[in-house]
């Protein structure tokens, strides 16, 4: 359920982009009416309207996630705060400058921040981030936890690079498809691979 919650802003970004892409004149009019005061020149063209409207939607959706968690008295993950900061800063630049290049960097920066936090935690603070998250559910040798931690670092680094490659070498519509389906699909494949790896190394329960 949490993974669906985490992917909700991406799904809404995808939905708004695809709808606006199919109704560009309507999207341009709406974006000019609602965002004209925020954009350079005051007018949004049909070509740029879909990504600008989708950017507004993803900012609002990410903020709504945090407000919903706060209203229910739940802890807001640090990465969700980071995501809100990134999407607000890069999204605002995208809207003002009429340039999708800024928002295209958001997934990459977020992937690299997550990877860097795991790497710094392991090398500098001697704290394994993945073990902290999963250690209560399974018992593994420290050497295995390190391998798992570094594999996530490598995965996040690779995903950040892959996002940039798709974003700046293919049409924006292709990047939007990759952002939802490619990102989710690769994450699922990686998690399944991790599950098989962990299953081989789980220590047997000898307490019974």
UniProtKB/Swiss-Prot annotation:
The keyword Cell inner membrane applies. It holds the Pfam family IspA. This is Inner membrane-spanning protein YciB. Keywords: Cell inner membrane, Cell membrane, Membrane, Transmembrane, Transmembrane helix. The lineage of its organism: Bacteria, Pseudomonadati, Pseudomonadota, Betaproteobacteria, Burkholderiales. GO terms for cellular component: plasma membrane. It is a multi-pass membrane protein. It comes from Polaromonas naphthalenivorans (strain CJ2). Plays a role in cell envelope biogenesis, maintenance of cell envelope integrity and membrane homeostasis. It is found in: Cell inner membrane. Belongs to the YciB family. The chain crosses the membrane at residues 49-69, 78-98, 105-125, 150-170, 178-198. The keyword Cell membrane applies. Its main location: membrane.
């Amino acid at each position: 359920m949490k993974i669906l919650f985490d992917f909700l802003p991406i799904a809404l970004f995808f939905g708004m982009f695809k709808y606006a892409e199919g109704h560009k004149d309507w999207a341009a009019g709406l974006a000019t009416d609602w965002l004209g005061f925020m954009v350079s020149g005051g007018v949004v063209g049909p070509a740029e309207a879909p990504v600008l409207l989708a950017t507004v939607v993803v900012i609002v959706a990410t903020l709504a996630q945090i407000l919903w968690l706060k209203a229910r008295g739940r802890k807001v993950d640090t990465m969700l705060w980071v995501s809100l900061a990134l999407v607000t800063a890069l999204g605002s630049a995208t809207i003002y400058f009429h340039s999708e290049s800024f928002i295209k960097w958001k997934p990459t920066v977020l992937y690299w921040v997550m990877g860097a936090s795991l790497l710094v935690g392991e090398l500098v603070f001697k704290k394994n981030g993945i073990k902290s998250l999963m250690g209560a559910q399974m018992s593994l040798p420290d050497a295995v936890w390190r391998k798992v931690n570094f594999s996530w670092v490598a995965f996040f680094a690779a995903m950040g690079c892959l996002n940039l490659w798709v974003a700046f070498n293919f049409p924006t519509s292709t990047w939007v498809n990759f952002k939802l389906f490619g990102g989710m699909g690769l994450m699922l494949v990686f998690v399944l691979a991790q599950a098989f790896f962990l299953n081989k190394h789980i220590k047997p329960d000898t307490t019974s």
